[in-house]
């Protein structure tokens, strides 16, 4: 998302100068970005890079996007009227989590309690399909359309170390101007816009509107 460099930990100018980066700082916070849109954009950029004789490297982000490239898209019906999303938007965070635990305990335990967006999305998918995310993924047929061959590298840290690093990183980001970045975005965008509903921005927006104690901000994020 544009204007969200600190909170989304975008690569620094120095890092971006070292090699060309794609799909960074290109989307308005008011826009919704779907797995389908990502797959389409990836296919275009992948071809551009390989046509130049270079090797594309897919870095970071949500595991769902990698799954989309490997297995194709999940078959989820569209909420054409928007009624399901409207109903869920009216629920509190605790209500979302309680309802999710009842119908999809795996997603409930996998998704961080503060991640309203992913918790709500998992609940929305269940309401639209009658199936949990894990059920949909297990029934998915691999999509050979992309024909990608790649090594997969990842870091596997102890959970305690991971939590410690997250806490340190959150404090560094807050000290680096994350609150000011969010305040600037709120001058032109609603706190309910897709970008500002992501982890951290949502809690900072709540803090700025006095819905959340500033002393508990870092812990809530």
Language-model-detected regions and their locations in the chain:
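Phosphate/pyrophosphate-binding catalytic cores of soluble transferases and nucleic-acid-acting enzymes
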Residues: 1-221
């Amino acid at each position: 998302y544009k204007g969200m460099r600190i909170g989304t930990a975008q690569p620094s100018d120095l890092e971006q100068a070292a090699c060309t980066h794609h799909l960074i700082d290109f989307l308005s916070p008011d826009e919704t970005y779907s797995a389908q849109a990502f797959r389409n954009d990836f296919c275009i950029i992948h071809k551009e890079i390989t046509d130049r004789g270079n090797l594309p490297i897919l870095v970071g982000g949500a595991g769902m996007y990698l799954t989309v490239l490997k297995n194709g898209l999940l078959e989820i019906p569209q909420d054409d009227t928007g009624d399901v999303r409207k109903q869920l938007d009216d629920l509190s965070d605790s209500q979302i989590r309680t309802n999710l635990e009842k119908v999809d305990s795996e997603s409930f335990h996998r998704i961080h309690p503060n991640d309203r967006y992913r918790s709500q999305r998992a609940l929305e998918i269940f309401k639209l399909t009658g199936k949990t995310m894990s059920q949909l993924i297990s029934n998915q047929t691999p999509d050979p359309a992309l024909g990608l061959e790649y090594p997969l590298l990842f870091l596997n840290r102890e959970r305690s170390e991971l939590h410690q690093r997250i806490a340190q990183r959150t404090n560094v980001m807050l000290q680096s101007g994350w609150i000011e970045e969010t305040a600037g975005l709120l001058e032109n965008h609603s706190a309910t816009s897709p970008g500002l509903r992501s982890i951290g921005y949502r809690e900072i927006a709540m803090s700025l509107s006095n819905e959340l104690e500033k002393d508990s901000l870092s812990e809530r994020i």
